[in-house]
């Protein structure tokens, strides 16, 4: 259910874009993201930091898009979010000396420190590359191409990278000696 809720604003954005335009889609995105945040609070009495950060960025960049009637702001939101994710991952590894991915998954998975570091760095690079791809597609290709890339391309890339990360983790998990 939670994964569905995470994708709901994206689905709403896409539907409103196809039915109306980028400004209706942006308005719908802001409203849907707020509804998901409120639902999460009411249902679970908890709002994850990433969900809150995402909402703030959606509200700010979406609000600027609507106020100035300029879609460049909502296009930048994607890259800013990816830059923040990459920055948090790199900061955790290089400054805090403990990869963020390890902080998030370390209780569930026993992996060597080098694996955590590589995985953390790989995700940081992934987010940087996605952010750069977004800049290129958002500002050099037609708007409809960007919307499709944002909804389908980035979602597919993230799913594939998650799968590859899972394979990488599986290959480095301690083996049970009883088999």
Curated annotation (Swiss-Prot):
Family from the record: Belongs to the YciB family.
Subcellular location(s) per record: Cell inner membrane
Topology class, membrane: Multi-pass membrane protein
Transmembrane annotation, as ranges: 22-42, 50-70, 76-96, 121-141, 149-169
Function in brief: Plays a role in cell envelope biogenesis, maintenance of cell envelope integrity and membrane homeostasis.
GO cellular component: plasma membrane
InterPro entries: YciB (IPR006008)
Primary location class: membrane
Entry protein name: Inner membrane-spanning protein YciB
Keywords of this entry: Cell inner membrane, Cell membrane, Membrane, Transmembrane, Transmembrane helix
């Amino acid at each position: 259910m939670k994964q569905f809720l995470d994708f709901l604003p994206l689905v709403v954005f896409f539907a409103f874009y196809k039915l109306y335009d980028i400004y209706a889609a942006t308005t719908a995105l802001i409203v849907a993201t707020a509804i998901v945040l409120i639902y999460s609070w009411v249902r679970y009495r908890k709002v994850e930091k990433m969900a809150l950060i995402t909402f703030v960025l959606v509200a700010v960049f979406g609000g600027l898009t609507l106020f100035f009637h300029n879609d460049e702001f909502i296009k930048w939101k994607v890259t800013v979010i990816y830059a923040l994710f990459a920055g948090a991952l790199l900061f955790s590894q290089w400054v805090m000396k403990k990869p963020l991915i390890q902080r998030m998954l370390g209780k569930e998975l026993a992996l060597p420190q080098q694996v955590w570091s590589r995985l953390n760095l790989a995700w940081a690079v992934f987010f940087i590359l996605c952010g750069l791809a977004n800049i290129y597609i958002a500002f050099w290709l037609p708007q409809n191409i960007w919307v499709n890339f944002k909804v389908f391309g980035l979602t597919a890339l993230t799913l594939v990278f998650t799968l590859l990360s899972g394979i990488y983790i599986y290959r480095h998990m301690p083996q049970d000696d009883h088999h």
